[in-house]
Swiss-Prot record:
Binds 1 zinc ion per subunit. Belongs to the eukaryotic ribosomal protein eS27 family. PROSITE patterns: RIBOSOMAL_S27E. GO terms for biological process: ribosomal small subunit assembly; translation. One of its GO terms (molecular function) is RNA binding. It comes from Methanosarcina acetivorans (strain ATCC 35395 / DSM 2834 / JCM 12185 / C2A). The keyword Ribosomal protein applies. The lineage of its organism: Archaea, Methanobacteriati, Methanobacteriota, Stenosarchaea group, Methanomicrobia. This is Small ribosomal subunit protein eS27. Keywords: Metal-binding, Ribonucleoprotein, Ribosomal protein, Zinc, Zinc-finger. The keyword Transport does not apply.
Length: 62
C-alpha cells in the first residue's frame, strides 16, 4: 500500500556550536539569522528556502 499523505519538508535540527560546544535546536527553514544563545556565533542564515547551516548538525528531529 502506498502512503499518499503529505508531510512537511522542513525539519528541526539539533546543532552544536563550533566555538562553545553548546547544543541547540533550530528550525531548518528559519527566516531570520540564528545565533548561539551562549556565545553569539551565527549558526544559520536564511536563504529564501532552507537555511544555510554554518555549524555541525548532530541530529535531524522528526
Amino acid at each position: 500500500m502506498v502512503d499518499y499523505t503529505q508531510r512537511p519538508k522542513s525539519r528541526f535540527l539539533r546543532v552544536k556550536c563550533n566555538d562553545c560546544e553548546n547544543e541547540q535546536i533550530i528550525f531548518g527553514s528559519a527566516s531570520r539569522k540564528i545565533t548561539c544563545v551562549v556565545c553569539g556565533r551565527t549558526l544559520a542564515e536564511p536563504t529564501g528556502g532552507k537555511s544555510t547551516i554554518t555549524t555541525h548538525i548532530l541530529e535531524v528531529l522528526e
